[in-house]
């Protein structure tokens, strides 16, 4: 029933929910940024919905998906078996090793290295072990990257900290989630995220603002987005 409702909402001629608006904006950014041979990373690949869009707009590139939940990883490997996509069964972070991972069985999209707040009272979760790795260690130093999408339920700062050299080298456009209810469980904050991107000479904007060529956020503006729960999906891009 829930999947049927979601499919009906997707067919509406307007954005019914904030998540649907984010999806529309993400698709528009991918279309604008990617050339046919662009290479992209989907960190927190889940079912591959964003990766599908990437493959459509960059059919000649080499793309990489990262998904630590074993069952979802296996599904992705099968789905992309005969494509130009490589799927890694790993949780990207700022450390290398093995870590406990909170798998939300009833709502896998809420899963992460730390247990986040839930919107519903009866979510069912379990603790599993997953491999963690820094993108800087895992990724080929010679491959150019045009776009990175990060949706890891609060762990985005850790992912970014483990990808500093890759970002410096390739200067990709980065679409990322950062919201109250998840990010604070990783000792993350908009101040820390803003400082990291500033050190990389990056701006942060709403996706819609970037698409409309509007100005980027100041620190105070970005903080207000987070603490007042105005938005939780953003784009970072080189100045």
Q: What kind of feature is each model-predicted range?
A:
Residues 1-239:
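Phosphate/nucleotide-binding beta-alpha loop and adjacent structural elements of enzyme active sites
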């Amino acid at each position: 029933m829930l999947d049927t409702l979601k499919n009906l909402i997707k067919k509406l001629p307007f954005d019914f929910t904030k998540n649907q608006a984010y999806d529309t904006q993400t698709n528009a950014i991918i279309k604008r940024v990617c050339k046919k041979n662009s290479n992209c990373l989907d960190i927190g690949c889940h079912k591959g919905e964003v990766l599908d869009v990437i493959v459509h707009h960059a059919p000649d590139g080499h793309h990489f998906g990262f998904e630590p939940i074993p069952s979802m990883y296996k599904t992705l490997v099968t789905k992309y078996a005969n494509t130009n996509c490589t799927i890694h069964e790993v949780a990207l972070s700022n450390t290398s090793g093995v870590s406990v991972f909170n798998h939300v069985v009833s709502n896998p999209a809420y899963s992460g290295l730390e247990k986040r707040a839930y919107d519903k009272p009866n979510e069912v979760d379990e603790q599993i072990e997953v491999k963690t790795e820094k993108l800087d260690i895992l990724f080929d130093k010679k491959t150019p990257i045009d776009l990175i999408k990060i949706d890891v339920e609060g762990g985005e700062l850790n992912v970014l900290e483990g990808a500093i050299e890759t970002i410096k080298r390739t200067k990709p456009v980065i679409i990322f989630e950062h919201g109250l209810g998840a990010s604070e469980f990783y000792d993350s904050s908009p101040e820390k995220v803003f400082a990291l991107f500033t050190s990389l000479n990056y701006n942060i904007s709403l996706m819609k603002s970037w698409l409309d060529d509007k100005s980027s956020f100041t620190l105070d503006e970005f903080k207000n987005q987070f603490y007042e729960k105005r938005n939780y999906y953003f784009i970072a891009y080189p100045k």
